[in-house]
């Protein structure tokens, strides 16, 4: 067996169907496009959502909602992520960014109560959920809003 003798196993590769290459192929002549009409022409076809001139569904339905330009998006950290820090550490947004717990500061950091905190930590963040604040204090640490 040499490299040039390698072949894929029988039936593992299917040959591509080349359309418009003779009647005998079964896909010659019209090449699967049918007879005449917009879709048979080169470059033919209609844009997505086009309904033959009828008002399209997306235009028949009303617009809804708006984007609040003053929206604040906080970087979210759950309690179980804080277990990676040593006992007694002061956890700040800068430290979370440095250690890769969060990738961006955004509008600040919000601590959420998912998971269980097993260490006594001083956590400084822009926001805390009620359950997160409770859990930090229950573990003997402090939760400071900055």
Swiss-Prot record:
- Annotated keywords: Ribonucleoprotein, Ribosomal protein, RNA-binding, rRNA-binding
Q: Which domain of life is it from?
A: Bacteria
Q: Where is the composition biased (Basic and acidic residues)?
A: 1-13
GO cellular component terms, A-Z: cytosolic large ribosomal subunit
> Region Disordered: start and end of each range?
1-57
Q: Where is the composition biased (Gly residues)?
A: 21-31, 42-52
Q: Which GO terms describe its biological process?
A: translation
Under the heading Gene3D superfamilies, the entry gives:
3.100.10.10
List the molecular function annotations (GO) for this entry.
rRNA binding; structural constituent of ribosome
Family membership noted in the UniProt record: Belongs to the universal ribosomal protein uL15 family.
Query: Subunit info?
Result: Part of the 50S ribosomal subunit.
Task: State what this protein does.
Answer: Binds to the 23S rRNA.
| HAMAP family assigned to the protein according to its UniProt record, in alphabetical order | Ribosomal_uL15
Q: What is this protein called?
A: Large ribosomal subunit protein uL15
Which species expresses this protein natively?
Bacillus subtilis (strain 168)
């Amino acid at each position: 067996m040499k490299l040039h003798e390698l072949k894929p196993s029988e039936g593992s590769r299917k040959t591509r169907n080349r359309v418009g290459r003779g009647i005998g192929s079964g896909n010659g002549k019209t090449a699967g496009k049918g007879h005449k009409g917009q879709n048979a022409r080169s470059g033919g076809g209609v844009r997505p959502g086009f309904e033959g001139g009828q008002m399209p569904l997306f235009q028949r339905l009303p617009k809804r909602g708006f984007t609040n330009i003053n929206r604040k998006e906080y970087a979210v950290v759950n309690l179980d992520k804080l277990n990676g820090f040593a006992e007694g550490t002061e956890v700040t947004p800068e430290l979370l960014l440095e250690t890769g717990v969060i990738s961006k500061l955004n509008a600040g950091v919000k601590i959420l109560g998912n998971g269980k905190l097993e260490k006594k930590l001083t956590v400084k963040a822009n926001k805390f959920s009620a359950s997160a604040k409770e859990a930090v204090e229950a573990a003997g640490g402090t939760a400071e809003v900055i």
